[in-house]
Amino acid sequence: MNKSPIEEEFDLRKQHQKLLKKNCQKEIEDFVKCATGRTFSVTWKCRSENKTMKDCLTKAADEISEWQIRSEYNKAKQESFIGKQDEKK
């Protein structure tokens, strides 16, 4: 089944976010642990955890290029297409 360009875009962004979250799992868990059970006080009580988490995600986003993921996805898509063409011959 072929995906629409919008579905492909959604999948690529989801894959990129998954990699970012995996890379910063500890920082995210630390922030969640601090924020659990708080409402307004999260702003000042969890400031350092929030900064650490954001810094990690920013650094990971610089290292894990969304365009690299797109390139790998397109390469796999082309290989799949070529494989199907070879089967038809």
Curated annotation (Swiss-Prot):
Keywords: Chaperone, Disulfide bond, Membrane, Mitochondrion, Mitochondrion inner membrane, Repeat. Disulfide bonds join C24-C56, C34-C46. A motif (Cx9C motif 2) lies at residues 46-56. It is found in: Mitochondrion inner membrane. It is a peripheral membrane protein. InterPro entries: Cyt_c_biogenesis_Cmc1-like. GO terms for molecular function: copper ion binding. It comes from the Eukaryota. Its main location: mitochondrion. Pfam families: Cmc1 (PF08583). A motif (Cx9C motif 1) lies at residues 24-34. Residues 21-64 form the CHCH domain. GO terms for biological process: mitochondrial cytochrome c oxidase assembly. One of its GO terms (cellular component) is mitochondrial intermembrane space. Required for mitochondrial cytochrome c oxidase (COX) assembly and respiration. The twin Cx9C motifs are involved in the recognition by the mitochondrial mia40-erv1 disulfide relay system and the subsequent transfer of disulfide bonds by dithiol/disulfide exchange reactions to the newly imported protein. PANTHER family: COX ASSEMBLY MITOCHONDRIAL PROTEIN, COX ASSEMBLY MITOCHONDRIAL PROTEIN HOMOLOG. Belongs to the CMC family. This is COX assembly mitochondrial protein 2.
